[in-house]
Curated annotation (Swiss-Prot):
Regions of compositional bias (Acidic residues) in chain numbering: 299-308
Leader peptide range in chain numbering: none
Basic residues compositional bias, start-end: 354-371
Organism: Arabidopsis thaliana
Biased composition annotated in UniProt, kind: Basic and acidic residues: 342-353
Protein name per UniProt: Protein NO VEIN-LIKE
Region (Disordered), start-end ranges: 283-375
């Protein structure tokens, strides 16, 4: 080969050392870069190369025959690649090349007179394979926690494909580098969908659950496998390097968070102390200058009988918003005397002034004051009413409960009171009268009575009017005098142990076709489900607080009903498990609950490991009772079985 006359080399070159004007090389600049300076041009160094070709090296012929041969080889490469993908094997350039050479009955590509890069399909496969190999090495090397799911998602995003199979390299789990970095997933069919973020979150949960600093990798992976419902940790497809570093980072982050919260709480406490000290000083100033106070706005709607009295008292003001105890007693006493005088003057009158309130109003939540009683009016009454005015027949009470029980269930207390007053025409057409009634009902003691009544009616909803239970029908041959505590056993002044009496408004009857029954059906399924969910939540929080870091408490029905014969699983560090079934109620007198056949069989199977947690729900707290090993408790007589007759049954009247 020979260079050009000016010492440069031609850019043209034969692909495989063929003859030509040059062998390909670098063309130096012949013009100076800086035009303001004169640079002395030096003569290029000439190199004389052998122009004689190696006759033993076969050179490809790029004529028509060569193109046909390349097309045939390219087609063989594509067919081989498709067959490997269909078989579920990994696709690599080496494997495809060897298979194509075997099909063409050639030992090497040199014997065919071409290179591997000359085949378009093979060249594209080599480029893609090298890119994927480099990406996997860098991705795994740069991350301490890597999952197969993360790796597949990253490769697909980098190559703009939907899944790894679209690359035409076979399954991801069959890739040689995947088997190198994740050797335990060789028998898996698909990677588990778990991200590195989930691994870190589970590591945080693991540290909170067991409260340990020295985390063992195998134990933590077992914890992750159980959380993801995977049969073994080997199938997770998770690679973790330097686990201790992540544990340290999480602990440092929690420590910093605690310090920040401590600073914020300290600032809030200081601010609260400042506000409290200011309020105490204001209260001290108010109490030191206490005078009698009458609110004019609260009596704007009263009748004209008190206008003169309000004018006389208008000169009394106070810096304290509440009356003193002596003034309140004085006002209540004068109001009582005024009403008694009106009662004596209008005994035969139907005027509503009999029950009209004076200027001293009831305040919600006011402190109870003891009112002294004089000797001359010790037996007097504020209201001129008889005991007969407060009597209510059993039928009327039953009608009232059946009328308003749905309203109590659906409406709030304020809307319920409004509907109640409107239904019995107690609201009145006058605005002043409506405001008076609303104010009275929303104040003590009436507001307390309303809430008590609403709670009782709501309780009757869940129990399906528990007063319909007949004592003699609870258990055959069961004496009520020695029975366990139940709603039927609650104190009742109208019954005795010797005579069976139906509770409340149900009368005793010898007609067995209309006898009272214990209702346990799902008439109020929505409310029962809500109570059950609340009871499970309370029991879950109780056991979590009780065991702390000593055991792991799992709520199986937290997101949806599983149908299992238990609601909670308590697993200690030794691997022992306890199964807790929660039974919840809002009734203080309900000491029974339903138990399915599956639950009873499971209780018999687990024995001491099966616990019934009975939760009595209250307004602000709950009472939890545990019963362990139901079968043994039944054998020892501590529990009783209750058999209910079906609602549809064949009955025969027998005369005697």
């Amino acid at each position: 080969m020979q260079g050009n006359r000016d010492g440069s080399w031609s850019l043209r070159a034969s692909a495989y050392g063929g003859s030509g004007n040059g062998n390909g090389g670098y063309l130096p600049q012949t013009t100076p870069v800086f035009h303001n300076y004169i640079v002395k041009q030096q003569q290029p160094i000439r190199y004389n190369f052998q122009t004689q070709q190696n006759l033993n090296f076969p050179h490809p012929q790029f004529g028509g025959g060569a193109n046909v041969e390349l097309i045939r080889i390219d087609k063989a490469v594509n067919n081989t690649r498709k067959s490997l993908i269909a078989a579920g094997d990994n696709v690599s350039s080496t494997r495809v090349s060897q298979s194509v050479l075997a099909q063409l009955q050639a030992d090497t590509w040199r014997s065919l007179g071409i290179w591997m890069q000359d085949v378009p399909s093979l060249r594209q496969l080599m480029a893609l394979e090298g890119k994927i190999i480099a990406f996997i090495h860098c991705f795994i090397g740069a991350r301490g926690i890597v999952t197969l799911h993360d790796l597949e998602v990253a490769i697909c995003q980098n190559e703009f494909v939907g899944c790894f199979d679209d690359l035409g390299l076979g399954p991801l789990l069959q890739h040689p580098l995947v088997l190198l970095y994740f050797p335990s997933v060789y028998c898996s069919t698909a990677p588990v969908k778990i991200t590195s973020e989930e691994i870190i979150s589970l590591l945080d949960s693991y540290l909170n659950t067991y409260d340990i600093d020295d985390v063992k990798l195998d134990e933590f992976l077992d914890f992750v496998a159980e959380a993801k419902a995977v049969t073994s940790k080997e199938k997770l497809g998770v690679r973790i390097q330097n686990l201790r570093m992540y544990v340290s980072f999480i602990q440092d982050a929690k420590r910093q968070e605690g310090e920040i919260l401590k600073i914020v709480l300290t600032e809030l406490h200081q601010k609260y102390r400042i506000l409290s000290s200011k309020k105490q000083r204001q209260d001290k100033d108010y109490c030191g200058k206490h005078t009698r106070f009458n609110s004019p706005s609260s009596e704007e709607n009263d009748s004209a009988d008190y206008e003169v009295e309000n004018v006389k008292r208008s000169d009394h003001f106070s810096s304290c918003p509440y009356s003193s105890a002596e003034e309140e007693v004085k006002q209540l006493g004068s109001s009582s005397k005024k009403r008694k005088a009106e009662s004596r003057n209008h005994e035969k009158s139907d005027s509503p002034k009999l029950l009209r309130r004076g200027p001293s109003k009831l305040r919600r939540g006011h402190v109870k004051q003891k009112i002294p009683k004089s000797a001359d009016d010790s037996d007097a009454q504020i209201f001129s009413v008889n005991d007969a005015d407060f009597t209510l027949s059993e039928g009327a009470l039953k009608l009232f409960i059946s009328t308003w029980k749905e309203t109590c269930k659906e409406l709030s207390i304020s809307v319920f009171v409004k509907k109640l007053l409107s239904f019995y025409n107690l609201g009145g057409s006058e605005v002043h009268g409506q405001i008076k009634i609303a104010t009275a009902v929303s104040s003590f003691p009436f507001v307390g009575l309303l809430h008590v009544a609403k709670e009782l009616v709501t309780e009757a909803l869940e129990e399906q009017i528990p007063t319909e239970i007949t004592i003699t029908n609870l258990v055959a041959g069961y004496n009520d005098c020695t029975g366990t505590r139940s709603r039927a056993n609650m104190p009742n002044p109208t019954k005795s142990c010797s005579t069976p009496v139906t509770l409340a408004h149900n009368s005793v009857s010898t007609d067995f076709s209309i006898r009272n029954q214990l209702h346990t059906g799902a008439l109020w399924a929505a409310q029962a489900q809500e109570s059950g969910k609340k009871g499970e939540e309370i029991a879950y929080r109780y056991f979590v607080a009780k065991y702390g870091k000593k055991a792991l408490v799992k709520w199986v029905n937290e997101h949806s009903e599983t149908g299992l014969p238990y609601d909670l699983i308590i697993e200690n560090r030794g691997g022992n498990k306890e199964y807790v079934e929660v039974k919840a109620t809002v009734s203080t007198g309900k000491d029974y609950f339903n138990l399915s056949v599956k639950e009873w069989e499971f209780a018999n199977e687990k024995g001491e490991s099966y616990v019934i947690a009975h939760v009595l729900l209250g307004n602000s707290n709950a009472i939890l009772t545990q019963q362990r090993n139901l079968v043994k408790l039944r054998q020892d007589g501590h529990l009783r079985l209750l058999i209910l007759m079906p609602s549809q049954r064949n009955e025969v009247n027998v005369a005697f």
